[in-house]
Amino acid sequence: MASATPAMSENAVLRHKAASTTGIDYESSAAVSPAESPRTSASSTSLSSLSSLDANEKKDEYAGLLDTYGNAFTPPDFSIKDIRAAIPKHCYERSTIKSYAYVLRDLLCLSTTFYLFHNFVTPENIPSNPLRFVLWSIYTVLQGLFATGLWVIGHECGHCAFSPSPFISDLTGWVIHSALLVPYFSWKFSHSAHHKGIGNMERDMVFLPRTREQQATRLGRAVEELGDLCEETPIYTALHLVGKQLIGWPSYLMTNATGHNFHERQREGRGKGKKNGFGGGVNHFDPRSPIFEARQAKYIVLSDIGLGLAIAALVYLGNRFGWANMAVWYFLPYLWVNHWLVAITFLQHTDPTLPHYNREEWNFVRGGACTIDRDLGFIGRHLFHGIADTHVVHHYVSRIPFYNADEASEAIKPIMGKHYRSDTAHGPVGFLHALWKTARWCQWVEPSADAQGAGKGILFYRNRNKLGTKPISMKTQ
């Protein structure tokens, strides 16, 4: 990203303005009268008028749409062809050698940190127990950062952005993700489904927001009451955030939490009688899960084998060196990895400016614009390989390797115009603040109060905390 978006008030939309990429003067072109046009026939004029009427009708169809900040919204009107054409060809090039260099760098960071702490942060060198506790706590944070970077490399493998060779990508990703207790192929397939259905209320596979009806059911309230409930207490918000950061990732793998729950529609019939939740038959470990197709079953088994080998290795190390040591060496850093994965993914897809679409109004281009870039400073750029900084372009062209994503991201901004979203204020501190802000602002989605026709199929975040655009009042309905 070339530059951070200037800090603005909380009610402002963080957007990049459209920039013209051609030398055409659209204003002077439009000012040419039919008589001066090279095509002066009646049919030409009539077609022009019809086109203008269609455009006006289309515009009116989406009038009255407001995001959570109260900004007017219209759906994207560019095409995926426009996006792909704007990206320089060399951005698509993948280098196996360069990718492995980053793997080695991350492994070196992990091993060097372990060596230094294991050999120097000892009772002999540091007699103070409190000081050793603080230093080993720092160790868990550092290892969590480095391991998250390695996890991101595995994510690259899942998109075949690691190498032109699918075999090399999958083998590398399987090893990396298995070591981090991630079922590689299982997650690869569900993540692919997420990319294909991003922003679709019936297809998206991750951080799909609740509808007003679902939120009311969760709270045990009538739908009409939701907008008039008292404000959620900050302590409740904080506890919810802590719980999500601790167990959000394993909960997603085991129950498909935050994914869609329309499994009855699985085309092979694998979703009949299955639903999200513990014991519901929807998870990332069972080859029969409706998340997958029958042809993918053998890869789910391979993912489970990878997890089995990793768990066996951890059990051996725990018995060999002690479980207290393993808690510090592996399991606490693992919790930090969980935290970063959930935080990054949540904030990539949740923001007061972002819409969601019903099935009838969704398409791939609109879905790709349901994402936002975030700035994590040095940590995001270098340790996390830019996964939060260039997520928008990643959703349009996922095979672009992360080391080319900055240039590709800059290339598509003029095409996306106002539909490109970024929140880059205050770096890592701003990122963590965004966790709190989105939890308070983004609680469910519903249509805009003044939406008409097709516009009712475009949903925006609302909340009970009296923040931003008010929810629809149903008292008189």
UniProtKB/Swiss-Prot annotation:
InterPro entries linked to this entry? FA_desaturase_dom, FAS_N, Fatty_acid_desaturase
Q: Which GO terms describe its molecular function?
A: oleate 12-hydroxylase activity; omega-3 fatty acid desaturase activity; oxidoreductase activity, acting on paired donors, with oxidation of a pair of donors resulting in the reduction of molecular oxygen to two molecules of water; phosphatidylcholine 12-monooxygenase activity
CDD domains (UniProt xref): Delta12-FADS-like
Task: Show where the record puts the motif Histidine box-1.
Answer: 155-159
> Any stretches that span the bilayer, and where are they?
101-118, 133-153, 167-187, 234-254, 299-319, 327-347
- In residue numbers, the region (Disordered) covers 26-48
- The annotated regions of Low complexity compositional bias extend over 27-48
What biological process terms from GO does the record include? fatty acid biosynthetic process; fatty acid metabolic process
List GO terms (cellular component aspect): endoplasmic reticulum; membrane
Going by the entry's taxonomy, the superkingdom of the source organism is recorded as Eukaryota
Record note on biotechnological use: Mediates gamma(3) desaturated fatty acids (e.g. densipolic acid) and ricinoleic acid accumulation when expressed in S.pombe with a temperature-dependent toxicity, at 30 degrees Celsius but not at 37 degrees Celsius.
Q: In which pathway does it act?
A: Lipid metabolism; monounsaturated fatty acid biosynthesis
Kindly report the protein's main subcellular placement as a broad class: membrane
* Motif residue range(s): Histidine box-2: 191-195
Provide this UniProt record's keywords sorted from A to Z. Endoplasmic reticulum, Fatty acid biosynthesis, Fatty acid metabolism, Lipid biosynthesis, Lipid metabolism, Membrane, Microsome, Monooxygenase, Oxidoreductase, Transmembrane, Transmembrane helix
Q: Report how it sits in the membrane.
A: Multi-pass membrane protein
Key word Membrane present: yes
Q: EC number(s) on record?
A: 1.14.-.-
Q: List locations, semicolon-separated.
A: Microsome membrane
General function of this protein: Oleate hydroxylase involved in the biosynthesis of ricinoleate (12-hydroxy-cis-9-octadecenoate), that is present at high levels in C.purpurea sclerotium tissue. Exhibits delta(12) hydroxylase activity on 16C and 18C monounsaturated fatty acids (i.e. oleic and palmitoleic acids), and, to a lower extent, gamma(3) hydroxylase activity on ricinoleate.
What is written about domains in the entry's comments?
Answer: The histidine box domains may contain the active site and/or be involved in metal ion binding.
Return the similarity comment: Belongs to the fatty acid desaturase type 1 family.
| Full protein name | Oleate hydroxylase FAH12
